[in-house]
Amino acid sequence: MRRISDLPNVVAMKVTGGSSIALTIQAFQLCGDRILVSDPMPDRWFFTIPKYGQQWAGAGPFYCMQTPENPRIVRIFDNLIKGEIDKAMDIFWEMSRPGPQGSLADSYFHTGIVTALTDKYAHWCAGGNGGTVRQPTGRLYDYQKDGIRAGMKALGITPREPEEEFYVGRVNYAKGYRLKKYEA
């Protein structure tokens, strides 16, 4: 891992969300003095920011936990940067009360199949474009969508409607695109 930071065009490294904490710590210890290292998982920031000086979050499903009116994740990160851990913790627990959303709502990691479709759905519910992911992908079940929508509502986020908009994408839906009706 240290050799990555020797490459002249490498300035940062994102430790994939959901990986082991040991990998996160090792990445900061081996590369953190030479390149910017990021773990995108908010619960890890409580030690990666104060101990290792993490400066950025990398990509993650933050959109399903905040809105422009209430940027919870941004506030957590900013408070941790300022050393205001108690304030960050209050926001974290407020956000965690309803239970996890997106991919964490029904952890597909246990299935051995990793798909971003639940995260895409949660993003769409919070105002994102939606649209499905490339094939092959897993199916998004009604109970998963119901759980994501319930979590959104508990956070004070009104999920988007109609469902069809998710599948074609918000932008395409606004242009008049609709799902094709397939007959058996």
Sequence positions of predicted segments:
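Catalytic alpha/beta core domains of metabolic enzymes, predominantly
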Residues: 1-111
